[in-house]
Amino acid sequence: MFMGEYQHTIDAKGRMIVPAKFREGLGEQFVLTRGLDQCLFGYPMHEWKQIEEKLKALPLTKKDARAFTRFFFSGATECELDKQGRVNIASSLLNYAKLEKECVVIGVSNRIELWSKVIWEQYTEEQEDSFAEIAENMIGFDI
């Protein structure tokens, strides 16, 4: 399980050191893809395979299903960590998430997310005020 928030930097070659606490969970190979809310999602291979099966089961006759799977899979890249624990992020993914030098890596249960520091700060500021309301509106959820 992934959890926590870490501040990191991306070098001029598009490489980022993956937080040590996330490396074992991601494994030697993992997938980075376009996520929601202008961030990147990172999945261990076993999680990616489960998502792949669910998305393959969506009906091709549904326009939204086709659009989502195209967007999700076309942005996906298999990644490996180098000996220093860095991942090389594809330029198309860097552009999508507006990732520059400063970034935030967060753990979200079965995945990690990579955010532009600026976008993450804006997002958390917007969500902090409505966190209790969001929790209240989630059906069948209690903490």
Swiss-Prot record:
Q: Name one GO biological process term.
A: negative regulation of DNA-templated transcription initiation
Look up and give the organism this protein is from.
Bacillus subtilis (strain 168)
Gene inactivation effect: No visible phenotype.
Q: Which InterPro entries match?
A: MraZ (IPR003444), MraZ_C (IPR035644), MraZ_dom (IPR020603), MraZ_N (IPR035642), MraZ_sf (IPR038619), SpoVT-AbrB_dom (IPR007159), SpoVT-AbrB_sf (IPR037914)
| Principal subcellular localization | cytoplasm
Source domain of life is Bacteria
Q: What's one GO MF term for it?
A: DNA-binding transcription factor activity
The protein depicted here goes by the name Transcriptional regulator MraZ
Q: Which gene encodes it?
A: mraZ
- Disulfide cross-links: none
